[in-house]
């Protein structure tokens, strides 16, 4: 009887093959690695990868990491228990299989998921990403990807930095996304050269980092004037080489920003009035308008007391940007009471060699002239012309006051 049972077991094995090893968190990476190195052994041990039962797996992070040849059909995988998919297809440059029916509702981390998955262009619009909190560089360098994901529920996501970094084909409407929880958008559309969709209604009030956000996004020219950027501290390179962008952002509250390094570097089209920005907290404006060739706006009243001298490359190559439109470095121009009532006053010529003439004053007025260090160098009253011949060549600010109101005008002494 025992011999009969043994023969029956051997017969079953010979017909149906060897018993396959179950896929778990502990062995799934080993199984994938074996599939890559020895397809026959992997099939014998685990079965065909398309049919693997991965329903008990919770961690698929880096599963196909740096696996440029992998392109097998895994559409039927049950990933409903997976919580971590970060870097899952990182540098899986050949992968382009339909995985749009996956149940990813348990996943919380999709950062770098398709980073350098350069062939991927599958419809994943039906994915439930409602529990995902991290999408940093999710499609970074996924240069072929251009699928409609505008209906995704991204309300739990807090980090989208680099999400479409070098995703050069992507140009899908995502203007209805709820990004109110996002704090990090640094480099989000860096070199997303096709993207030009309306995102002006986004609630970005939680965002603190917008550095490099639209760098090299050469097609972008959408109205984002209503964005609440009051919590942003970093705008480094934000519009660097965003060569099409020219939208009114002069009403932005940038009072919390500390760094505007190269913010409009090579933003060759931009020419919007931003003279009312409160930049008093900014510590670095190096290269801010470098080769921003169209920019000709008066920002002379900016409060730049944190920056004692003209930053490196501030407006290099911006040939039409007048010197008297620049801030007075190291100073914070005082704000006058009812300042607009003195705007009928003007000075000429500017620049001047010897004498400044004041026009428009009808009441006794006092004049104080300050150098770029904020030091008063000349004070005079009740005259319509001021002899400045003795002043060294340079940039100055003349404060004009009637004792109650005041205004400040910048001039250049040749």
Question: Language-model segments: what does each one mean?
Answer:
Residues 1-20, 379, 397:
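Bacterial Sec-dependent N-terminal signal peptides
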Residues 2-9, 83, 118, 218, ...:
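Intrinsic-disorder/low-complexity peptide segments enriched for small residues
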Residues 3, 25-28, 350:
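Alpha-helix initiation and N-capping motif
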Residues 340-414:
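C-terminal outer-membrane/trafficking sorting elements
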Residues 18-335:
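Negatively charged
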């Amino acid at each position: 009887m025992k011999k009969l049972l043994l023969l029956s077991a051997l017969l079953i094995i010979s017909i149906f093959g060897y018993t396959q090893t179950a896929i778990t968190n502990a062995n799934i990476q080993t199984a994938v690695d074996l599939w890559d190195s020895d397809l026959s052994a992997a099939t014998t041990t685990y079965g065909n990868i398309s049919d693997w039962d991965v329903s008990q797996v919770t961690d698929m992070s880096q599963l196909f990491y740096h696996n440029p040849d992998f392109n097998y059909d895994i559409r039927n995988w049950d990933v409903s228990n997976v919580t971590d998919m970060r870097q899952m297809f990182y540098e899986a440059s050949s992968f382009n299989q339909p995985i749009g029916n996956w149940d990813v509702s348990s996943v919380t981390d999709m950062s770098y998921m398709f980073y350098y998955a350069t062939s991927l262009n599958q419809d994943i619009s039906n994915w439930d990403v409602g529990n995902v909190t991290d999408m940093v560089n999710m499609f970074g360098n996924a240069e072929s990807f251009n699928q409609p994901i505008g209906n995704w529920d991204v309300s739990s996501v807090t980090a989208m930095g680099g999400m479409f970094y070098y995703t050069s084909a992507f140009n899908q409407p995502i203007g209805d996304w709820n990004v109110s929880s996002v704090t990090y958008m640094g480099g989000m559309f860096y070199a997303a050269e096709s993207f030009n969709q309306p995102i002006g209604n986004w609630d970005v009030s939680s965002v603190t980092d917008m550095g490099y956000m639209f760098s090299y996004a050469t097609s972008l020219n959408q109205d984002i004037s209503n964005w609440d950027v009051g919590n942003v501290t970093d705008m480094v390179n934000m519009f660097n080489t965003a060569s099409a962008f020219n939208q009114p952002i002069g009403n932005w509250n940038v009072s919390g920003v500390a760094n505007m390094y190269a913010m409009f570097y090579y933003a060759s089209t931009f020419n919007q009035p931003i003279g009312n920005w409160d930049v008093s907290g900014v510590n670095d404006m190096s290269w801010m308008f470098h080769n921003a060739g169209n920019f000709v706006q008066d920002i002379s009243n900016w409060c730049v007391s944190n920056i004692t001298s003209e930053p490196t490359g501030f407006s290099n190559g911006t040939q039409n940007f007048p010197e008297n439109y620049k801030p007075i470095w190291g100073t914070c121009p005082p704000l006058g009471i009812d300042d607009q009532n003195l705007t009928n006053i003007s000075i000429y010529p500017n620049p001047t060699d010897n004498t400044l003439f004041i026009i428009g004053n009808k009441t006794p007025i006092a004049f104080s002239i300050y150098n770029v260090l904020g030091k008063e160098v000349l004070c005079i009253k009740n005259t319509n012309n001021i002899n400045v011949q003795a002043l060294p060549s340079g940039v100055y600010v003349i404060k004009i006051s009637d004792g109650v109101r005041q205004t400040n005008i910048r001039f250049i002494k040749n």
